[in-house]
Design a protein with these regions (language model features):
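A conserved short helix/loop substructure at the end of the activation segment
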Residues: 163-174
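Regulatory extensions appended to serine/threonine kinase catalytic cores
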Residues: 177-180, 184-200
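Conserved structural core of kinase catalytic domains
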Residues: 1-15
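Activation segment/activation loop of eukaryotic-type protein kinase catalytic domains
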Residues: 40-78
Length: 200
């Protein structure tokens, strides 16, 4: 996004997130599982025009999606061959939550932390480095990431904590509602529009 849309702010990123969520909702209504959900398979024309590409890998009925990435795959499915099991809507929602997280903290995977290893090694609930309760931060990445996290709405942080720290399933509508609320707050001037904080 940085090169293609250099003038974008948080409203643009949040609207992209909302349109991806709506796209997933529409497909799920027809029992179509995306399976291989990742940024490379999403084409963004502008914040309101978003397309899913490489749709030949969609899981339809008993035909599994045979490809994927660890980062967008729930931990319980790590080690399995993608073509040997059928994914669920919950698998798509986990991948979607990861994508939305990376839009809110631009480019940063949820389990990335200071001193961490590979993406696959990092993907454990106890490694989620952002503050979810009184326990505080846990080796959060250096730089602006703690600041950005601290300025996200409570509802959205709660959803990320449920998915990445507590390993819980969430409803698609809950993340959609949280993003819609965030857009409203941004448009009303209740939240900063900065994508990244230049100084802490």
């Amino acid at each position: 996004f940085k090169n293609k849309f250099p003038n974008w702010n948080r409203i643009h990123l949040t609207k992209v997130a909302l349109n991806i969520i709506k796209m997933v909702q529409d497909l799920h209504e027809y029992n179509i599982i995306i399976g291989d959900m990742n940024p490379n398979n999403i084409l963004v024309q502008d914040e309101n025009t978003v397309f899913m590409i490489d749709t030949d890998s969609f899981q339809i009925e008993e035909y599994p999606c045979s490809v994927g990435f660890n980062l967008y795959t729930r931990k319980i499915n790590h080690g399995k061959r993608y073509d040997e099991y059928l994914r669920t809507k919950d698998d798509d929602i986990f991948a979607l939550a990861t994508l939305v997280f990376q839009l809110m903290l631009p480019g940063k995977p949820p389990y990335s932390y200071s001193g961490g290893g590979t993406e696959k090694e990092n993907m454990k609930p106890e490694n989620f480095p952002y503050k979810c309760d009184k326990s505080g931060y846990n080796n959060a990445p250096d730089g602006q990431w703690v600041y950005i996290w601290s300025h996200l709405p409570f509802k959205l942080k709660e959803i990320f904590c449920q998915v990445f720290r507590k390993n819980l399933k969430i409803e698609l509508n809950s993340i959609k509602n949280a993003i819609e609320d965030y857009i409203y707050q941004l448009e009303q001037g209740h939240q900063t529009l900065e994508k990244k904080k230049k100084t802490f």
